[in-house]
Amino acid sequence: MLRAGVSTACLYPRVVEEALYDLALSGVSNVEIFINSHSELRRSFVDTMARLLHRFDMTCASLHPFTCEIEPTMLFSNYPRRADDYLEYCRHYFSAMQ
């Protein structure tokens, strides 16, 4: 089944937690959370967003990294250390998605 959703990025430049709250109040039940900074990957911040999702019975369908614009350079160059470092950094995103 196809489910429509809304990204917190649609409300940029509002900070992500305010955007998520606004979407919740608007009755949006399926969201993408667009991470805009490294600090938004901290466990305490992620836990706050998870509580908000739970409170409003929302589903996060995807977590969109702010680093997506550099992924081609980080992953597909002839510099293996850069790719290794970037994959290590991505662990922050993977952890946030759990």
Residue ranges and their predicted role:
Residues M1-Q98:
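N-terminal pre-domain/capping segments
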